[in-house]
Amino acid sequence: MSKVFFLVSVSLDGYLTPPGMDMAHAGDPTYEDWGAQWGKLHSWILPTRFFRETLKLGEGGETGTDDQIVEHTFRRTGVSIMGKRMFDLGERMWPEEAPFHTPVFVLTSQVREPWVRPGGTTFHFVNDGIESALRRARAVAGDRDIRIAGGADAIQQYLRAGLVDEFTLAISPVMFGGGPRLFAGIGRDVGVDLVETLASPHATHVRYAVHKGAMS
């Protein structure tokens, strides 16, 4: 059976995105530097060879630990699930060929027809909850895994429901001082076991297996 996982970049102080990176603050000059902060958070991804080639940003790029993690994550993912806030922001920012190349199920109250993009990405809009989205994802994942792409609220919902098998944090050397906390509202009933730690010049990658039960 497909595993359910997430892999996200987090700041050293535990935030998933910088303050102001949402539609509510679009155009607000107070938060105009969020793009630069987001770039720092993802400095381990953006220059890698696999990322650049996959998104058709040009040849070349960095190889090594970060590149291997990006490629492995992309190849193991057969379908993604994301929240509406992540989709709303991405709809404005992603290139025409969205960077998933798989089906994507969007958690939303909005009724909308599937949105087909070049390159193999089709966004499907799910109105009846996280378990329905997961059932639909399993039906199309094949022998690959299911990634909870974000944002924080979607990840938290799946963690609280006991539906996540493993996750990896790419901890970047940047402080945000605010924004959505990745594990806000997650209690002791979500237990984790450390599986692997890998370091690169840009981030520390920590992988955990998830189990139900109080954390020791």
Question: What kind of region is each of these model predictions?
Answer:
Residues M1-S216:
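Enzymes that bind and transform nitrogen-containing heteroaromatic metabolites
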